[in-house]
């Protein structure tokens, strides 16, 4: 019991200090050209959503933000590079509109902090994932420290709103995949499918998540001769595709052809 309390104190202190450092230093990082591209993409898709659902009270303000990018002629046109996932870019573009953010530096500073928060949450989940896998506090603690303080990952965790978001949702997905194999429940499959769908729209590599789960569920079915896994496989496929479609405007008009195009372009 004493060891358990000591371990809790260590991990709470560690994650508390990590959060404090992130809060103090998130605005110390520069801005890459890709961040401007994602900013443009977010406003473009927000404008699409606002018009698709006829949200009249936002139309003018969103269009004003979109038109401001006419000055950035060197940025990739989101009408052509229209397959970037929306999970980070669209909500932050909506924040810009709602709070009428005009200061350019603030655009990126709060985005850096949100990217860090995603990574911070993923590091907590990663610790619990290792704890489930190894059932050893020291291995889990040092494994998490390596995950966090890998120089490239740590630096990117404040500004890379594609790869860090992907990494975070991969961790979330794998955590729930482990939970599924502990004891299959519909809620776990739905959460896995949601996170895997977001990972896929962020980067095409996220496709390996549902494919891997389906393969392992099928292998488990062969091992125990049970037919129950078939319904869970079908649920995983259906819910994954549904979440992919629902959260990704790129797929709304022609889901199949757009998804094939996404794979071919990536």
What do the PLM-derived regions correspond to, one by one?
Residues 125, 129, 165-182, 191-196:
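Specific aromatic-rich, kink-prone transmembrane helix
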Residues 190-192, 205-220:
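Transmembrane-embedded, aromatic-rich helix segments that form part
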Residues 32, 158-165:
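Short acidic/glycine- and proline-prone juxtamembrane loop motifs at membrane-interface regions
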Residues 109, 113-134, 172, 176:
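Transmembrane-helix motifs of polytopic, lipid-linked glycan transferases
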Residues 48-51, 81-90, 100-103, 198-200, ...:
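Transmembrane-lumen/periplasm boundary regions of multi-pass, lipid-linked membrane glycan transferases
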Residues 12, 124-149, 182, 186-187, ...:
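Transmembrane-helix signature of polytopic, membrane-embedded enzymes
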Residues 7-35, 43-73, 146, 199, ...:
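Transmembrane signal-anchor helices characteristic of membrane glycosylation enzymes that use polyprenol
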Residues 140-148, 175, 196, 200:
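Short helix- or helix-capping micro-motifs
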